[in-house]
């Protein structure tokens, strides 16, 4: 058994600046479900930074960074209690399967200035 951990921190202002320079960033990085969630927020910026941070954390759990798969292969959703959950698709899902990872646990926190996330998974033989 092996434990996989990924963490990331993101400045909210940085994500704002990225979107100002690259308007298509939102569609390239985030799935329709993620964008729909963000549209419902009065102040989406901390949540946007949190989602981006979460995708980075999950990519670190997979051990690849965002290489070999699309940003949209990692989707962040929320259950009925508002808890963030990870849905893997495409090549990201295949990489997780190769590592014996069946589920990734995720925590996201943010303030008005920063968002951070931690992703943890158990994999390997007999996981």
From Swiss-Prot:
Give binding positions for Mg(2+).
8, 56
What is the name of this protein?
A: Holo-[acyl-carrier-protein] synthase
Query: Which BP terms does GO give this entry?
Result: fatty acid biosynthetic process; lysine biosynthetic process via aminoadipic acid
Q: Which cofactor does it need?
A: Mg(2+)
Q: Which top EC class is named for this enzyme in its record?
A: transferase
Identify one Gene Ontology CC term for this UniProt entry.
Answer: cytosol
SUPFAM superfamilies linked to this entry: 4'-phosphopantetheinyl transferase
Q: What is the lineage of its organism?
A: Bacteria, Bacillati, Bacillota, Clostridia, Thermoanaerobacterales
Supply the Pfam families for this chain: ACPS (PF01648)
Record's keyword annotation contains Secreted: no
UniProt cross-references to InterPro entries, sorted A to Z = 4-PPantetheinyl_Trfase_dom, 4-PPantetheinyl_Trfase_dom_sf, ACPS, P-Pant_transferase_sf, Ppantetheine-prot_Trfase_dom
Q: Name one GO molecular function term.
A: holo-[acyl-carrier-protein] synthase activity
Q: Which reaction does it catalyse?
A: apo-[ACP] + CoA = holo-[ACP] + adenosine 3',5'-bisphosphate + H(+)
In the record, the note on similarity to other proteins reads: Belongs to the P-Pant transferase superfamily. AcpS family.
């Amino acid at each position: 058994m092996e434990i996989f951990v990924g963490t990331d921190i993101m400045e909210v202002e940085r994500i704002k600046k990225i979107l100002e320079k690259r308007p298509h960033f939102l569609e390239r990085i985030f799935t329709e479900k993620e964008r729909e969630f963000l549209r419902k927020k009065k102040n989406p910026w901390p949540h946007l930074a949190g989602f981006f941070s979460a995708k980075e954390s999950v990519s670190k759990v997979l051990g690849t960074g965002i290489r070999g798969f699309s940003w949209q292969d990692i989707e962040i959703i929320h259950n009925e209690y508002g808890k963030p959950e990870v849905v893997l698709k495409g090549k990201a899902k295949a990489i997780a399967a190769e590592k014996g990872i069946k589920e990734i646990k995720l925590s996201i926190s943010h303030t008005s200035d920063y968002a951070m996330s931690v992703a943890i998974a158990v994999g390997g033989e007999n996981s």
